[in-house]
Amino acid sequence: AQTGLGRAEKIRRFWFGGEEMNRVLIMREKDFTEVKAFYWKLIEQMQGGSYLPGWEKGVYPSDIFLRESLRNRALYMLKCDGNYAAAMVLNHETNEGYSGTAWKVDADKHQVLIVHALGVLPAFQGKGVAKHMVKEVIRIAGERHQRAIRLDVLNGNVPALKLYESMGFEHRRTTQMFYEDTGWTDYLLYELVL
Protein backbone atom coordinates (compact mmCIF):
# COMPACT_ATOMS: atom_id res chain seq x y z
CA ALA A 1 0.00 0.00 0.00
CA GLN A 2 1.20 3.50 -0.75
CA THR A 3 1.37 6.24 1.86
CA GLY A 4 -0.48 9.49 1.31
CA LEU A 5 2.82 10.94 0.13
CA GLY A 6 3.36 8.06 -2.28
CA ARG A 7 6.99 7.79 -1.18
CA ALA A 8 7.35 4.40 0.42
CA GLU A 9 5.61 1.19 1.31
CA LYS A 10 3.81 0.82 4.58
CA ILE A 11 4.98 -2.22 6.51
CA ARG A 12 3.48 -2.20 9.98
CA ARG A 13 1.44 -0.05 12.39
CA PHE A 14 1.22 0.00 16.16
CA TRP A 15 -0.06 2.14 19.01
CA PHE A 16 2.02 3.57 21.82
CA GLY A 17 0.71 5.69 24.67
CA GLY A 18 -2.31 6.83 22.68
CA GLU A 19 -0.19 8.07 19.78
CA GLU A 20 -0.17 6.11 16.59
CA MET A 21 3.31 5.10 15.52
CA ASN A 22 2.94 3.87 12.03
CA ARG A 23 4.48 3.67 8.67
CA VAL A 24 7.75 1.87 9.04
CA LEU A 25 8.73 2.62 5.48
CA ILE A 26 11.14 1.14 3.02
CA MET A 27 12.60 4.29 1.57
CA ARG A 28 13.33 4.68 -2.14
CA GLU A 29 16.03 6.40 -4.16
CA LYS A 30 13.81 9.42 -4.76
CA ASP A 31 13.70 9.93 -0.97
CA PHE A 32 17.44 10.68 -0.71
CA THR A 33 17.04 14.38 0.18
CA GLU A 34 14.52 13.59 2.89
CA VAL A 35 16.63 10.75 4.32
CA LYS A 36 19.78 12.85 4.35
CA ALA A 37 17.92 15.72 6.04
CA PHE A 38 16.70 13.32 8.73
CA TYR A 39 20.20 12.07 9.54
CA TRP A 40 21.64 15.61 9.52
CA LYS A 41 18.87 16.74 11.88
CA LEU A 42 19.62 13.76 14.13
CA ILE A 43 23.34 14.60 14.18
CA GLU A 44 22.61 18.26 15.02
CA GLN A 45 20.15 17.44 17.77
CA MET A 46 22.42 14.87 19.41
CA GLN A 47 25.29 17.34 19.77
CA GLY A 48 23.94 18.66 23.06
CA GLY A 49 23.00 15.27 24.48
CA SER A 50 24.63 13.06 27.06
CA TYR A 51 25.74 10.55 24.43
CA LEU A 52 27.52 11.51 21.20
CA PRO A 53 27.49 8.76 18.57
CA GLY A 54 30.44 10.25 16.71
CA TRP A 55 28.40 10.61 13.53
CA GLU A 56 29.37 13.51 11.26
CA LYS A 57 27.45 15.17 8.46
CA GLY A 58 28.64 13.85 5.13
CA VAL A 59 30.98 11.32 6.79
CA TYR A 60 28.61 8.89 8.51
CA PRO A 61 26.20 8.14 7.26
CA SER A 62 27.79 9.25 3.99
CA ASP A 63 25.86 10.19 0.87
CA ILE A 64 27.31 7.11 -0.86
CA PHE A 65 26.14 4.82 1.97
CA LEU A 66 22.67 6.36 1.98
CA ARG A 67 22.27 6.22 -1.82
CA GLU A 68 23.46 2.60 -1.94
CA SER A 69 21.10 1.67 0.90
CA LEU A 70 18.19 3.35 -0.89
CA ARG A 71 19.07 1.68 -4.19
CA ASN A 72 19.08 -1.71 -2.43
CA ARG A 73 15.83 -0.93 -0.59
CA ALA A 74 17.65 -1.45 2.71
CA LEU A 75 16.86 1.86 4.43
CA TYR A 76 13.86 1.96 6.75
CA MET A 77 12.27 4.91 8.51
CA LEU A 78 9.51 5.15 11.10
CA LYS A 79 6.89 7.87 11.11
CA CYS A 80 5.13 8.87 14.31
CA ASP A 81 2.07 11.05 13.83
CA GLY A 82 3.34 12.15 10.44
CA ASN A 83 6.93 12.95 11.45
CA TYR A 84 10.02 10.88 10.84
CA ALA A 85 11.22 9.61 14.22
CA ALA A 86 13.80 6.92 13.43
CA ALA A 87 15.84 5.36 10.66
CA MET A 88 18.05 2.33 10.10
CA VAL A 89 19.77 0.31 7.41
CA LEU A 90 19.55 -3.48 7.16
CA ASN A 91 21.94 -5.40 4.93
CA HIS A 92 24.59 -8.13 5.00
CA GLU A 93 27.70 -5.92 5.06
CA THR A 94 30.08 -5.86 8.02
CA ASN A 95 33.18 -4.06 9.16
CA GLU A 96 36.39 -6.11 8.91
CA GLY A 97 36.39 -6.18 12.72
CA TYR A 98 33.55 -8.72 12.68
CA SER A 99 35.92 -11.41 11.41
CA GLY A 100 37.54 -13.50 14.09
CA THR A 101 34.52 -13.17 16.38
CA ALA A 102 33.25 -16.36 18.01
CA TRP A 103 29.69 -16.06 16.74
CA LYS A 104 27.17 -18.52 18.16
CA VAL A 105 25.80 -19.24 14.69
CA ASP A 106 28.13 -20.28 11.90
CA ALA A 107 26.33 -18.77 8.92
CA ASP A 108 27.31 -17.35 5.58
CA LYS A 109 27.02 -13.64 4.88
CA HIS A 110 23.55 -13.80 3.34
CA GLN A 111 22.08 -15.68 6.30
CA VAL A 112 22.84 -12.87 8.75
CA LEU A 113 21.11 -9.49 8.85
CA ILE A 114 23.32 -6.58 9.94
CA VAL A 115 21.89 -3.41 11.53
CA HIS A 116 23.51 -0.06 10.67
CA ALA A 117 22.84 3.60 11.46
CA LEU A 118 19.88 3.01 13.77
CA GLY A 119 19.03 6.42 15.13
CA VAL A 120 16.05 8.00 16.91
CA LEU A 121 15.46 11.75 17.09
CA PRO A 122 15.80 13.02 20.69
CA ALA A 123 12.14 14.11 20.79
CA PHE A 124 11.13 10.46 20.35
CA GLN A 125 13.72 8.86 22.63
CA GLY A 126 12.47 7.10 25.74
CA LYS A 127 9.09 6.38 24.09
CA GLY A 128 9.68 2.86 22.81
CA VAL A 129 10.62 3.93 19.28
CA ALA A 130 14.04 2.23 19.25
CA LYS A 131 12.51 -0.92 20.72
CA HIS A 132 9.88 -0.92 17.98
CA MET A 133 12.58 -0.54 15.34
CA VAL A 134 14.50 -3.52 16.76
CA LYS A 135 11.28 -5.56 16.82
CA GLU A 136 10.91 -4.71 13.14
CA VAL A 137 14.47 -5.91 12.50
CA ILE A 138 13.62 -9.21 14.18
CA ARG A 139 10.39 -9.53 12.19
CA ILE A 140 12.09 -8.74 8.88
CA ALA A 141 14.93 -11.16 9.63
CA GLY A 142 12.40 -13.89 10.38
CA GLU A 143 10.53 -13.25 7.14
CA ARG A 144 13.82 -13.49 5.25
CA HIS A 145 14.73 -16.75 7.02
CA GLN A 146 17.91 -15.28 8.47
CA ARG A 147 19.82 -17.32 11.06
CA ALA A 148 21.02 -14.36 13.13
CA ILE A 149 21.07 -10.59 13.50
CA ARG A 150 24.36 -8.86 14.27
CA LEU A 151 25.39 -5.30 15.02
CA ASP A 152 28.08 -3.22 16.62
CA VAL A 153 27.66 -0.59 19.32
CA LEU A 154 30.14 2.18 20.04
CA ASN A 155 31.61 1.72 23.50
CA GLY A 156 29.82 4.05 25.91
CA ASN A 157 26.43 3.98 24.18
CA VAL A 158 24.70 2.74 27.32
CA PRO A 159 21.08 3.22 26.10
CA ALA A 160 21.76 1.08 23.01
CA LEU A 161 23.57 -1.59 25.02
CA LYS A 162 20.67 -1.84 27.48
CA LEU A 163 18.12 -1.98 24.66
CA TYR A 164 19.83 -4.76 22.71
CA GLU A 165 20.53 -6.83 25.81
CA SER A 166 16.90 -6.46 26.97
CA MET A 167 15.79 -7.85 23.61
CA GLY A 168 17.97 -10.95 23.79
CA PHE A 169 21.07 -9.84 21.91
CA GLU A 170 24.24 -11.33 23.37
CA HIS A 171 27.61 -9.62 23.60
CA ARG A 172 30.14 -11.63 21.62
CA ARG A 173 33.25 -9.47 21.70
CA THR A 174 34.65 -6.00 22.24
CA THR A 175 37.15 -5.02 19.59
CA GLN A 176 38.80 -2.00 18.03
CA MET A 177 37.30 -1.14 14.66
CA PHE A 178 37.81 1.73 12.26
CA TYR A 179 35.00 3.85 10.88
CA GLU A 180 35.46 7.18 9.10
CA ASP A 181 33.46 9.09 11.70
CA THR A 182 35.08 7.65 14.84
CA GLY A 183 38.52 6.47 13.73
CA TRP A 184 39.88 3.48 15.65
CA THR A 185 37.83 2.89 18.78
CA ASP A 186 36.19 0.15 20.82
CA TYR A 187 32.97 -1.42 19.59
CA LEU A 188 30.89 -4.11 21.22
CA LEU A 189 29.67 -6.78 18.82
CA TYR A 190 26.23 -8.29 19.48
CA GLU A 191 24.30 -11.21 18.03
CA LEU A 192 20.72 -12.41 18.25
CA VAL A 193 20.26 -16.01 17.18
CA LEU A 194 16.95 -16.62 15.41
Where are the model-predicted features located?
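A short beta-loop-alpha structural element at the N-terminal edge
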Residues: 23-37
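Conserved GNAT-fold acetyl-CoA-binding loop/helix
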Residues: 44-64
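Conserved acetyl-CoA-binding loop-helix of GNAT-fold acetyltransferases
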Residues: 126-139, 166
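Conserved beta-hairpin
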Residues: 74-88
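A short helix-loop-beta-strand connector motif used in the catalytic cores of GNAT acetyltransferases and
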Residues: 67-77, 93-97, 114
